[in-house]
Curated annotation (Swiss-Prot):
The keyword Repeat does not apply. Binds 1 Ca(2+) ion per subunit. N-glycosylated. It is a single-pass type II membrane protein. This is Neuraminidase. InterPro entries: Glyco_hydro_34, Sialidase_sf. Changing Y409F: Complete loss of enzymatic activity. The influenza B genome consist of 8 RNA segments. Genetic variation of hemagglutinin and/or neuraminidase genes results in the emergence of new influenza strains. The mechanism of variation can be the result of point mutations or the result of genetic reassortment between segments of two different strains. Inhibited by the neuraminidase inhibitors zanamivir (Relenza) and oseltamivir (Tamiflu). These drugs interfere with the release of progeny virus from infected cells and are effective against all influenza strains. Resistance to neuraminidase inhibitors is quite rare. Changing R374N: 94% loss of catalytic efficiency. The chain crosses the membrane at residues 9-31. Residues 13-35 are annotated as: Involved in apical transport and lipid raft association. Homotetramer. It comes from Influenza B virus (strain B/Lee/1940).
Length: 466
């Protein structure tokens, strides 16, 4: 809190005596909570002064005997952020397309970076568009290897949301082939994972300082979520996993405060394979995540993490609408909610975001239009219910990417308005040039706004042959 009283004492000395003037300012206070944000800037207070003139007949002269005392009040430290109710709306609409390679014509600093695994994270003042680059641009001469997931050149980069991730626009945060980031209300936390497959390392950066690390625990490609971590009251929660892409891979959550790990959380329940979780706040008490099982099922593992007890449990989503790719026909998996069903090896990160309302909650999901390939992207919603036990089909809201266009990873995030949060889903639209040329992505963003129906899909507008 600010000091309750600020006193400014101005002492004016004159040739005729001492004039003492005491000015006491009114108490300064501020209120900052989940739905109120007051922005302060440095305030300079100057005590009033008096100019005394002395004149004689022989030598007219003006003498200023006043003294001025200035005090600067520093702005209060920003407050931690908390989830708030979502802004009003009943449908998502196309908000933004970031298609860097529409500008891939000239080499140099203005050339777009070759990226993959984009995501967006937001603080109180701005959202940033993150991605993992191969330290190469298009056009350029370093296309070889840009289809690989892991190498020594990959870095976590970001630009302010709405800017094109070119060489000159991008901030390079750290070496990483897997990443995450989030804002706690005061500062950014950046997460990067790199290193050899059998001994990878989580690295944490808070603001400009590299602050902590976390070592591999299964020695099989330690990796993180490729979307935003989630902060409440200064505590940020990050999902990591370590294990085989075609077998067991048990996830953990790291509780991070001001860039330092203060607790690790080992989930219970259906823990065989959980990776690439997309997480958000269902309430001030619970973080929920829709994740990927690359090994056993096309159903999404669904995490509930209690931030009051720091405990987490995982079960499979029970809905008949299967969200992974590849996947069987909807409703074709027999048995209880925990039944895996048939699984073709592979999977994809899925978009997921909450719509928090006073009387109910909406959960929005994305999935590819194709059951077998990373093509197209649809948006689904389910109001209320429990994803662990509710077997009803999800409601199709609309098509964000047509089946003729690429639909790869997707993610969720929330933009902070003045008094509410705007839920959004982003889609990675990959230009897949194979092993012989560049391999990079555009990002489409859809956000909750207004009512009616989702009206228009997104195209990248990129011809790789040009």
């Amino acid at each position: 809190m600010l000091p309750s009283t600020v006193q400014t004492l101005t002492l004016l000395l004159t040739s005729g005596g001492v004039l003492l003037s005491l000015y006491v300012s009114a108490s300064l206070s501020y209120l900052l909570y989940s739905d109120v944000l007051l922005k302060f800037s440095s305030t300079k207070t100057t005590a009033p002064t008096m100019s005394l003139e002395c004149t004689n007949a022989s030598n007219a002269q003006t003498v200023n005997h006043s003294a001025t005392k200035e005090m600067t009040f520093p702005p209060p430290e920003p407050e931690w952020t908390y989830p708030r109710l979502s802004c009003q709306g009943s449908t998502f609409q196309k908000a933004l397309l970031i298609s860097p390679h529409r500008f891939g014509e000239i080499k140099g600093n203005s050339a777009p970076l070759i990226i993959r695994e984009p995501f967006v994270a937001c603080g109180p003042k701005e959202c940033r568009h993150f991605a993992l680059t191969h330290y190469a641009a298009q056009p350029g001469g370093y296309y070889n290897g840009t289809r690989k997931d892991r190498n020594k050149l990959r870095h976590l980069v970001s630009v302010k949301l709405g800017k094109i991730p070119t060489v000159e626009n991008s901030i390079f945060h750290m070496a990483a082939w897997s990443g995450s980031a989030c804002h706690d209300g005061r500062e950014w936390t950046y997460i990067g994972v790199d290193g050899p497959d059998n001994d990878a390392l989580v690295k944490i950066k808070y603001g400009e300082a590299y602050t902590d690390t976390y070592h591999s625990y299964a020695h099989n490609i330690l990796r993180t979520q490729e979307s935003a971590c989630n902060c409440i009251g200064g505590d940020c929660y990050l999902m990591i996993t370590d294990g085989s892409a075609s077998g067991i891979s048990k996830c953990r959550f790291l509780k991070i405060r001001e860039g330092r790990i203060i607790k690790e959380i080992l989930p219970t329940g259906r823990v065989e394979h959980t990776e690439e979780c997309t997480c958000g706040f269902a309430s001030n008490k619970t973080i929920e995540c829709a994740c990927r099982d690359n090994s056993y099922t096309a159903k999404r593992p669904f995490v509930k993490l209690n931030v009051e007890t720091d405990t987490a449990e995982i079960r499979l989503m029970c809905t008949k609408t299967y969200l992974d790719t590849p996947r069987p026909d909807d409703g074709s998996i027999a048995g209880p909610c925990e039944s895996n069903g048939d699984k073709w090896l592979g999977g994809i990160k899925g978009g997921f975001v909450h719509q928090r309302m006073a009387s109910k909650i909406g959960r929005w999901y994305s999935r590819t239009m194709s059951k077998t390939n990373r093509m197209g992207m649809e948006l689904y919603v389910k109001y209320d219910g429990d994803p662990w036990t509710d077997s009803d089909a999800l409601t199709l809201s609309g098509v964000m990417v047509s089946i003729e266009e690429p639909g790869w990873y997707s993610f969720g995030f929330e933009i902070k308005d003045k008094k509410c949060d705007v839920p959004c889903i982003g889609i990675e639209m990959v230009h897949d040039g194979g092993k012989d040329t560049w391999h990079s992505a555009a990002t489409a963003i859809y956000c909750l706004m207004g009512s009616g129906q989702l009206l228009w899909d997104t195209v990248t507008g990129v011809d790789m042959a040009l």
